[in-house]
Amino acid sequence: MCACAVAGVAVSSLVVPTAESGEMKTKATAPVPQPGPIRKLARKKAKKKFRKSKALAGSGVPGSHPAAVAGRPPKAPENFSQNWKALQELLKQKSQAAEKPLVSQMDDKMHPQIIQQNRKKASDKSKGDKQRTEKAKSTRGSVTSAPTDRKILVPPTDTSGTEQKKGAKKRTYSDISSHQGALKPKWKATEAAVILNQPTPTEEDIWFDDVDPDDIEDAIGPEAAMLVRKRLGQKKRTISLEKEQAFGGLTKALALDCEMVGVGPKGEESIAARVSIVNQYGKCVYDKYVKPTEPVTDYRTAVSGIRPENLKQGEEFEVVKKEVAEMLKGRILVGHALHNDLKVLFLDHPKKKIRDTQKFKPFRSRVKSGRPSLKRLSEKILGIRVQQAEHCSIQDAQAAMRLYVMVKREWESSTANRRAPAATPQHRIKNS
C-alpha cells in the first residue's frame, strides 16, 4: 500500500500481482477525502469528467446507444406517433387556407361568379331594409304607444337618412310629454278614491270590552267613540274650565300658576317668566310677563311657550311680586305643585290656606300615583286634556281650580277636622 499526490489530490494505490507475468502492479483506488479546498477541487473535476462523458455518448450515431435515442427527439417519419402526424396535417390545412387571398382584394375579372353572388346578396339586403322602414312609417301614425311604454320619442333630424313626408306635422317634445302624462297609470287616483270613500264604522264593526271611550277616540276617531258611548249609555263629558257668565273679580279662592325659563350656565335654574291668576269660576284676574333679572340661557319654549319677544314687554319682577302678594293676602291659594311657583316669586303663604292638587290624597289614590301630574289628573278626573303642546299658565290655573271646585266640600271638611284641636280630659269632665 502506497500513497501519492497528483495535482494536489491524495490518491491511495494498491499493489496487486498480475496473473500473466507475476509482476507486481499498482492499482489506483478511490481518492482519500482531504480537508479544505482540496476536497472541493476534486468534486469539481469529477463533475466535469461526468459531463464530458455524457456529451460524447450523446454525440454518437443515432441508434448506437439506447439512452441517447431516448433523450433526443425523433427525426425519421416512421418514429413519429399518429397524433403528431394528425396535428401536422391540420396545421398544413390552416396555413393553406390563410395563404388564399380575399375576394374583395382581388380583381373583378379573376372571380366574376363570386362577385355577382355578393352583389345579389347586398341588393336583397337593401330591399329588405327599405320595406321595413316603409312599414314602420305607415304604422307609426296609426298605432299608439302602450301605456306601459316609457321611452321618449326623439323627432328625426336631417342627418338621419329618412325623409319626412310633406304636410306631416312635426312632433315636439311638449306634445310627447303631455301625451305621456295622459297615459299615466290611474292606480294612485283609484287608491285615493278608495281611502276617501271608506264607510264610517258601524256598531257591528266596533266591539270593545272595558275600554274607555276617550281612548277609543284617540285610537280610531270620534265616530267610533260616539258609537261606544251610545252603546254604554254614556254622554261625552263636556266640562268647561271657565264659566261664561260668571263673576270676573277676586273671589275667596284664587288659583296661581307660573311659567318659567332657565338661567345659569346650563339653564337648570328657574326664574318666573309669566304669572297668571284665575278666580273660583275660572276667570283670569291677573296675567303678566316678567322681565328676567338674569340672562336667560334656556327659554324652554317647547314646554313653557315663552319667547324672547314676550319678555321684552314684561313687567319688572318686584312690581309683579308685590301685586301678587296683595291679591293672595287672606285668600285660599289653589294650584298644582305650588311650592315651585311660590319659590320663583320669593313669596310665602300660610300652609292652612294652601290647596295643592298634587298632594290631595283622594286624587293620588284615584290615578294611582304618588306625585300625579296636572295633565294626568285633568284627563282622568275632568276628562279634559291640557298641556298637549306648549303649556299655558292660565289653562293650568283653570284646571287646578276646576279640580278643587269638584271636591271642595270634601277637601274643606277634611282640613277643618285636621285643624280642630283634640278635646282634653278636663274639658270633657266640665262638660259632663
From Swiss-Prot:
Q: Which residues carry this modification: Phosphoserine?
A: 123
Residue intervals of the Exonuclease domain: 230-381
- Recite the UniProt keywords alphabetically: Exonuclease, Hydrolase, Isopeptide bond, Nuclease, Nucleus, Phosphoprotein, Ubl conjugation
Protein name as it appears in the record: RNA exonuclease 4
Where is this protein found? Nucleus, Nucleolus
**Any one Pfam family match given in the protein's UniProt record, by short name:** RNase_T
Q: What is the lineage of its organism?
A: Eukaryota, Metazoa, Chordata, Craniata, Vertebrata
> What does this protein's UniProt record list under function?
May function as an exonuclease.
For the keyword Cytoplasm, the answer is: no
Question: Gene3D superfamilies annotated for this entry?
Answer: Ribonuclease H-like superfamily/Ribonuclease H
List the SMART domains: EXOIII
Similarity section: Belongs to the REXO4 family.
UniProt superkingdom: Eukaryota
Which EC numbers characterise this protein's activity in its record? Answer: 3.1.-.-
